[in-house]
Amino acid sequence: MRRRTSMVVTLLASGLILAAACTTELDPPTPLPVAPAPADDGAGPGSEDDDRADDVASEAPGLPPADRDLPRLSLEEVVTLEAPIDTTVLEDGTVLVAERAGRVRVLDGPTPDRIVLDVSGRTTTDGERGLLSIAVAPWGDELFVSMTDADGDTLVEAHPLDGAGIEGTPRSIYTTRQPFANHNGGPIVFLPDGTLLLGLGDGGGAGDPLGAGQDLSTPLGAIVRLDVRDGRVAVPSDNPFLEQADAAAEVAASGLRNPWRMAFDRPRGELWIADVGQSEREEINRVTPAQLLGANFGWALREGTVPFLGEEPDGHVPPLHDYGHGPGCSITGGLVYRGDAIPELRGGYVFTDLCDGELRVLMQDGADVTARELGVTATRVIGFGTDADGELLVLEIGGRVLRLVRD
């Protein structure tokens, strides 16, 4: 998840930083079968699959205007848990929340606070490890979980869902070795075509000592794209590096340091990726699924919009927005707000920073993108989510789940 000199003492106490010299080599990935490229299900801008899509599609493309008046906002506490880190919403509106230690609970619904999954005996919270992300499959009967196992390696598996409960044995989706206990990444999201995306950090250590960010032979520092429909685990045949002998076929995009977090905005058909920087810049990337394939987000040749280890790589996709260090130090990516309670925010990407906790929204200022402060601050935010109504949830490592509301 994190790193920063200015918060070393605090974050070490939370198990969120591990710095180590790198003396290891990357393992080659295990080959996966290839499946025909999945067809888009038609859910995108203007799709009937989102009850707000008609509204959104009628707006001009892009973010809301920066001169829009914003209301006074505040954060109300929903519940206190143990290091909540991610959420997902089931078909019936039940909200599940993942705790970093390995439990998935019902946040609200018929039986609030009920534990539906407990993998705490199979993971560890050393360094930046733990249960990192959850996502319900588009077909509704599987809960996908991204975590590090007891050895610290990345593990993605799918648990069969029966209503809001877990029934049966999980199926293994993907594993890869993690050389160190930081820069694990771990966010998972589904695209409209049913493919699963997994964001992975560069393997750890300052300055990308493994060279993973620009090394297509490893899934580290990359976004993995898999076809996991109908019980299969395969590489889609349109993955960009499938025919490249020295590349991992599952890699869809490269050049990431530590993606924290990813979100797919279904009405606009856009993937948002927040990538934690080294010591100068924090960045936010926005691409369509088509633009994702073969994208190079720059690390470690670039850090945000500035050079780091070399020249700008071929095919570089620069960030939509980046910012320097000051009050902030380590971005916590959010999502595009699609709720009804705060229409002034609708269509804006809300995010924060682990160090200063100020919630911000990306908005359009002419040809430029700017971040406006929302006037509300949380403490050490490590994730965002939504409730069943699409209202924004803020997750603090200290345990609080907060909802963004109008004053």
What are these regions (language model features)?
Residues M1-L12:
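Bacterial N-terminal signal peptides that target proteins for export
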Residues L18-A21:
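C-terminal motif of bacterial Sec signal peptides marking the signal peptidase cleavage site
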Residues L155-G163, D215-V228, R286-T288:
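Beta-propeller blade signature
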Residues R114-D126, P170-N184, V228-A252, F297-P327:
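Surface-exposed loop and turn segments in beta-propeller and other repeat-based domains
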Residues T23-G207, R261-F264, G269-E280, P327-M363, ...:
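Acidic, Gly/Ser/Thr-rich repeat motifs that build Ca2+-stabilized beta-propeller blades
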Residues W272, E280-N285, L293-G298, V306-E311, ...:
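Short acidic/glycine-rich loop or secondary-structure boundary segments that cap or lie
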Residues D368-A388:
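Conserved blade-ending motifs and adjacent loop-strand segments that build the rim/top face
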Residues L198-L220, R281-V287:
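Short, conserved, GDST-rich strand-edge loop motifs in beta-rich repeat architectures
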